């Protein structure tokens, strides 16, 4: 075998290994982001605020927007938005919501796109919801669904939230259903005012299509 042929084959092998390493890293990144989202969902059940806040980057440009509670900009504002007014100390000493509070929000149907540099990513999920929350001073059994469009940043090899945007489709009393009562409002708490108004807050039956971060995977449009 000529040395030129050997060099060519070695180069092809090196290029192939590099491509496979990049593809493997993307697979690992997608799995890590899915784990981040699922962890967030579990922490929301009893509103474990320290765990929730720990999922975020400390950057100044982080943002949180949850339907009609407003838009929060900057780490300090985002962290404060997750602080529950009436803390309950759980059996393990953690700060949580009171025992009757229930907020099960399950991420599903995720579509994640990692940027070529592997440092940032975007993702979209449905959030299926069952809860026991106070609305109008009463504890209500609620059923709901919404959509997340989130942005993530990789810091020190760890994926964290950069922007979290959740648009409720329905949040309805279980005994009434979403056709009768599509949404029970949940305005921001007085002690946690947002940085600004919502940019997306459209519920059923508006027909609103929450903007996609990605193009059609077949047509590219």
Task: Indicate residue ranges for each PLM-predicted region.
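Short, low-complexity N-terminal intrinsically disordered segments enriched in polar/charged residues
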Residues: 1-42, 46, 50, 54-55
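Short beta-strand edge/turn micro-motifs at domain boundaries
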Residues: 5, 120-124, 145-178
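A solvent-exposed, acidic/Ser-Thr-rich amphipathic alpha-helical stretch
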Residues: 49-129
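Extracellular/periplasmic carbohydrate-active domains that bind, remodel
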Residues: 87-95, 126-136, 147, 183-185, ...
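Short aromatic-glycine motifs in intrinsically disordered, low-complexity regions
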Residues: 96-99, 136-141, 153
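Short, surface-exposed coil-to-beta transition loops
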Residues: 105-107, 142-148
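Short, cysteine-centered beta-strand-loop-beta hairpins and adjacent loop/turn segments enriched
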Residues: 130-142, 170-172
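A hydrophobic membrane-anchoring alpha-helix module
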Residues: 169-171, 178-221
